[in-house]
Each structure stands twice: as structure tokens, then as C-alpha cells.
């Protein structure tokens, strides 16, 4: 596994940005002192190859029953394609909503009711987008074995949402691992470390306090 190298390159290439004084706003409305733009990883051949290799090994270990790899549009699609190639498995991808033209499909690619599908997304914050993809796949008759991602913040909301949906998810990298690496490498100050740790414990409370 290449966890340390991947995290180091994510930091080096500023794919992960830390800004405690000017926090970012996520799609959920959550304020955060950190932003992870994993869409940029496709621009770095060595990085994307390490990610694909480690994700493939992770899926083979955690979901040995997998017969199809699914990409969650849009950021999960390139990584799903690379993993499907390495595992020599068929691939599908899932849109956020059905097309409004043509055949009106939400899922592209073929699968049967006997297939075991593993969906890949780049990042899990609250889990909303990938769990919508799970619902869409199951609505079309697919069986979702679980979800894999490059990175997760391991936020309480995500844990609760996956538990409620009864969906297994396995990340390659997690926020606690990133925070530990950032702290050890000296890329962040002790004050920044404390801010990032406090945010992780209760993101909504942190955002509310920041705005007060």
C-alpha cells in the first residue's frame, strides 16, 4: 500500500487545502477549514496509479464477491475505470439523476440481478451523493456489495447515514490519518492542528461558532 506517498503528494500538489481563517462551504452547507479536491488527482499519472493500485487491493480484500465496479459521477468515474481495468471487471457508472433525453437512463453499463456491485466515489463527506447512487442502483435491480472511496472525513453524519442505509463502506485514506501526517510533517502549526481536530469532532458546531 502507498498510503504515506499518496498523502504526501496530495499535500505537495495542494490537492488538500487548509484555511482555518477563511473556511470553505461544502455542498451540504457545512463550513470547513479543509478542502479536498480529489478531482485533481487524474492530472498526476504516478499518483492516480498508486490510488488505483491501492483501491484495487482494498476492494479485492474487502469485497471479494465483487463482479462489477461502479463509478459515481463525476469524480468517481475515472478511478472506477482504472480499478475495473486492474481487476479486469466490468464497469458501470451512476449519474446524480436520469438523463432528460434519449433513453433517460441514470445508470450506464450493463449488470444483472446476480451481480455484486462495488461503487467508487472520490470523497465521502456526509455520504449523501454516493448513497443516492446506491439507491438508484438498487432501484434498477442491482445489488450493491458496498462503497469504496479514496478519502473520507469520517464525520459523524457519514457514519450515521451509512449505518441507517445498512451499506458497508471502506475508504483508502481517512481524515485522522491525514491529520496525523500533516502534524508530524510540520505542514501545520499546533494551533491549526487544534482547529482541525475540533472541527472534526463536531463540524456543525464549529461552523456555528465561527459565524458567531
Curated annotation (Swiss-Prot):
Protein's recorded name: Orotate phosphoribosyltransferase
InterPro entries reported for this sequence: OPRT, Or_phspho_trans_dom, PRibTrfase_dom, PRTase-like
Family: Belongs to the purine/pyrimidine phosphoribosyltransferase family. PyrE subfamily.
Residues annotated as binding orotate: 125
Signal peptide: none
EC annotation from Swiss-Prot or TrEMBL: 2.4.2.10
Entry binding sites for 5-phospho-alpha-D-ribose 1-diphosphate: 95, 99, 101, 121-129
Classification via HAMAP family: PyrE
Subunit structure of this chain's protein: Homodimer.
GO molecular function: magnesium ion binding; orotate phosphoribosyltransferase activity
Keywords, alphabetical: Glycosyltransferase, Magnesium, Pyrimidine biosynthesis, Transferase
Alphabetical GO biological process terms: 'de novo' UMP biosynthetic process; pyrimidine nucleobase biosynthetic process
Cofactor: Mg(2+)
